[in-house]
Structure formats: structure tokens, C-alpha cells
């Protein structure tokens, strides 16, 4: 039996399969987006319901920035002393989640009050790196050990309890749930592999298999569009690669710098991709033909 969360999201995906109206515009061409003020740790972009971008690496390592539609950045909130943010995600209620790689935490932030709470702290975590979120609010966290070249995967249930789902992997980094909620993608940066796990009852991870391997360059953050195409940053190559659900490379986009660290979909229609690029210490953006999965979830939650 297919659970109701899969049916609901599947129905939404079907409603979005009709051709999306595309007016005369330039697609797949990156342009500088953000103002100055970021540093080489710029990472973890995520968009809220309005399409506004948030990311880390703005001045102090604790700061999370909000970037206005015209590219101006301002400090939104600072994490507690001793913390450093990386991946950011929003749930369907609008709450923000931040991976804290120095404090071994995942924080939850109320955007309205800017109150920060520790959702989970686990000393077994190396350094929570990036986050993915399922439609029911289950979080997944990649957890690399860069020194040893190994990594773990965590599932964080809706009660804030962390469950180690995989260990002994390579340097786990970018992570994303498929639109139908049945698969979890995770890449290993150093090993240049993307794995896919089956997601079972309660969000538990099942069998895994290699989805895609590359002969060179590394990986960082990843996101899906509404059709299930996976957009992955190629760290060292300076591109974002678009990969179909059948593991076919559909397109590769130059992002104007060699070290893209992560990406998200945003804007009013969900068809603007924002990329954090560490070499130039800025955000770049480009337009695409189909909206992102995050945008689809925002639409479904309205």
C-alpha cells in the first residue's frame, strides 16, 4: 500500500507535468546575484515560501544571511557561540533547520521570532553537513569525516531523535529526497559517487545502489526539480550538472567560478536556481525550465 504522503505529493507532481509557460528568456546562463559581505564558507542556500534566499558564510561563521530579490545581503540571525552553519532547509510550516558542523547539532529556527532551539545534538556525529527533508518533516543529514575520508547518514524523526542509518560510507555530502518520497540521493564528494537509497516505512533507509559515478572533480550540494531531475554541484569543475531520474546527464551549467558549494530553487515561480560559489564568495543565479521540488511543496502547503 502506498502511504498518503506519497499519494499527495505524487498528485502534485502530476499536476505540474503539463508544459510550464516559458516566455522569451535566457535559460541555463549564470549571472552574479549577491552583493559583497560573504566569505569562502558561503554555503547552504535555501528559499522560504516567498522565494527569498538564506545562506551561511556571511561575515562571521555563525551568521545566516537573508538575500533580498535584488541581491542585497543582510544578517538574519546568528547561531549560538561555538556553532557554524552549513546546510539549511525549510519545512512546510516555514520553520528553518540548520546543520551545525562544529557543535554536532541540528538547529530549528522560527523565522518570525528568530528563536533558535537545538532540535538534536549527538556526540556520535562527526560534523552535520547538509540536510534533506521529506514531505512529512523527516530530516536526513549527511555527516562526513574529511580526515578519514568516511561518512555517515542520519535520519532525524519528527520528535527530534537521531537515528544512524548508514556508516562506513565515503565523504557523504549533498543529499536530497526524490519528489515521490521513495528515494534518498546522497553523494560522496571525494569518491565522486552518487548513491540512491530506498526509503521505507517511517523514513528508514533500505537498499542502496550507485546512481551515478564521475571520473573527476568532486560533488557538493544537490536539489531535485519537480520532475525528479537531480541538480548537483561539481566542486572543482565550476558547474552544476542536471541528471535525469534514469541517471542520464541532461545538461551542465557553468556557474562562473570553480567551487560551487550548494544550490536551491527559488524565486516567485520556483524556476530560479541560486548557487553559492566559494571562490568568488558570492551567489550566482540562473533560470531553468521547471520548478524546484521545494517550490512545489510550498505550493502544496498553501
Language model features with spans:
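Blade-level signature of beta-propeller repeat domains, shared across WD40, Kelch, NHL, RCC1
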Residues: 262-302
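Beta-propeller domains
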Residues: 55-74
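Short loop/turn segments that connect beta-strands within beta-propeller blades
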Residues: 67-72, 110-114, 156-160, 199-202, ...
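A short helix->beta-strand "capping" segment at the edge of beta-propeller domains
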Residues: 24-38, 208
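Bacterial N-terminal signal peptides
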Residues: 8-19
Amino acid at each position: 500500500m502506498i502511504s498518503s504522503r506519497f499519494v499527495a505529493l505524487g498528485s502534485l507532481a502530476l499536476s505540474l507535468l503539463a508544459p510550464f509557460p516559458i516566455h522569451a528568456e535566457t535559460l541555463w546562463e549564470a549571472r552574479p546575484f549577491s552583493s559583497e559581505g560573504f566569505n569562502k564558507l558561503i554555503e547552504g542556500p535555501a528559499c522560504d515560501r516567498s522565494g527569498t534566499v538564506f545562506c551561511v558564510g556571511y561575515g562571521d561563521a555563525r551568521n545566516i544571511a537573508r538575500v533580498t530579490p535584488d541581491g542585497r545581503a543582510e544578517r538574519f540571525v546568528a547561531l549560538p557561540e561555538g556553532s557554524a552553519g552549513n546546510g539549511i532547509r525549510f519545512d512546510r510550516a516555514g520553520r528553518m533547520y540548520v546543520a551545525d558542523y562544529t557543535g554536532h547539532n541540528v538547529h530549528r529556527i522560527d523565522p518570525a521570532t528568530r528563536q533558535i532551539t537545538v532540535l538534536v545534538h549527538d556526540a556520535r556525529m562527526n560534523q552535520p553537513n547538509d540536510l534533506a527533508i521529506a514531505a512529512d518533516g523527516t530530516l536526513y543529514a549527511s555527516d562526513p569525516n574529511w580526515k578519514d575520508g568516511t561518512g555517515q547518514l542520519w535520519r532525524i524523526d519528527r520528535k527530534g531523535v537521531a537515528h544512524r542509518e548508514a556508516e562506513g560510507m565515503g565523504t557523504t555530502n549533498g543529499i536530497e529526497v526524490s519528489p515521490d518520497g521513495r528515494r534518498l540521493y546522497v553523494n560522496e564528494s571525494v569518491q565522486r559517487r552518487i548513491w540512491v537509497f530506498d526509503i521505507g516505512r517511517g523514513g528508514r533507509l533500505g537498499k542502496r545502489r550507485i546512481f551515478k559515478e564521475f571520473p573527476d572533480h568532486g560533488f557538493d550540494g544537490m536539489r531535485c526539480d519537480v520532475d525528479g531531475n537531480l541538480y548537483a554541484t561539481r566542486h572543482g569543475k565550476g558547474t552544476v550538472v542536471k541528471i535525469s531520474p534514469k541517471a542520464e546527464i541532461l545538461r551542465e551549467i557553468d556557474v562562473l567560478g570553480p567551487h560551487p558549494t550548494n544550490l536551491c530553487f527559488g524565486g516567485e515561480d520556483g524556476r530560479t536556481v541560486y548557487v553559492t560559489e566559494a571562490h568568488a564568495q558570492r551567489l550566482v543565479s540562473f533560470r531553468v525550465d521547471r520548478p524546484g521540488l521545494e517550490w512545489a511543496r510550498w505550493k502544496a502547503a498553501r
